[in-house]
Amino acid sequence: MNCRSEVLEVSVEGRQVEEAMLAVLHTVLLHRSTGKFHYKKEGTYSIGTVGTQDVDCDFIDFTYVRVSSEELDRALRKVVGEFKDALRNSGGDGLGQMSLEFYQKKKSRWPFSDECIPWEVWTVKVHVVALATEQERQICREKVGEKLCEKIINIVEVMNRHEYLPKMPTQSEVDNVFDTGLRDVQPYLYKISFQITDALGTSVTTTMRRLIKDTLAL
């Protein structure tokens, strides 16, 4: 199985990290979640509905749509909060990345553990910029909103391609494909990781600074 890989890059102010990352992660998971499966008998099931809600950002001129699952939202906020704190405490240039990996399990014979086979990975590279004035922050608020809108549109375009998704499992195999631990939604199995690094390029940050500078010059 070939694993699809998508890479996004964003440049944000420190207080925008959490909202930007939640917007991206929630958008991806909105398209990689189903309602809960209700099995009547093996091979016959119905799928519940997935509720959605709009989220208005406080520090970015942007509104995104997420699955209306408080459990899923708490899980994402926890890991994004850890990422934000790690960026803040890194003492470097505020460079890092988060990866959202979707996978399915392949049963192995005892005593070996199940094999996790990734089929799609989303990586978001983040560079935190330091701004000196409130005017710069206001411009950044608008520009990040515009850039984030472009990223979300790109995500939706990728999701609409007719590419591989794990086939719908039987009742006995549903835990190999979906996370059934949430009460109100059923995302494909996923895991989120992050790292703080100084190996990322500065092109995105340079572009953001130029946008702010050009706007101030108007």
Curated annotation (Swiss-Prot):
Protein role: Autophagy factor required for autophagosome formation. Stabilizes ATG13, protecting it from proteasomal degradation.
Recorded superkingdom: Eukaryota
Protein's GO biological process: autophagosome assembly; negative regulation of cell population proliferation; positive regulation of autophagy
GO CC terms: Atg1/ULK1 kinase complex; cytosol; endoplasmic reticulum membrane; phagophore assembly site
Protein's name according to its UniProt entry: Autophagy-related protein 101
Consequence recorded when altering V156D: Abolishes interaction with ATG13
Chain residue ranges for the region called Important for interaction with ATG13: 152-156
Effect of I153D: Abolishes interaction with ATG13
Gene name for this UniProt entry: ATG101
GO MF annotation terms: identical protein binding; protein kinase binding; protein-containing complex binding
Result, substituting D54R: Impairs interaction with ATG13
Homology family: Belongs to the ATG101 family.
One Pfam family, short name: ATG101
UniProt entry keywords in alphabetical sequence: Autophagy, Cytoplasm
Effect of H31S: Impairs interaction with ATG13
Main location per the UniProt record: cytoplasm
Cystine pairs: none
Location(s) in or outside the cell: Cytoplasm; Preautophagosomal structure
Listed result of changing I152D: Abolishes interaction with ATG13
UniProt subunit comment: Interacts with ATG13. Associates with a complex composed of ATG13, ULK1 and RB1CC1; the association with this complex requires the presence of ATG13.
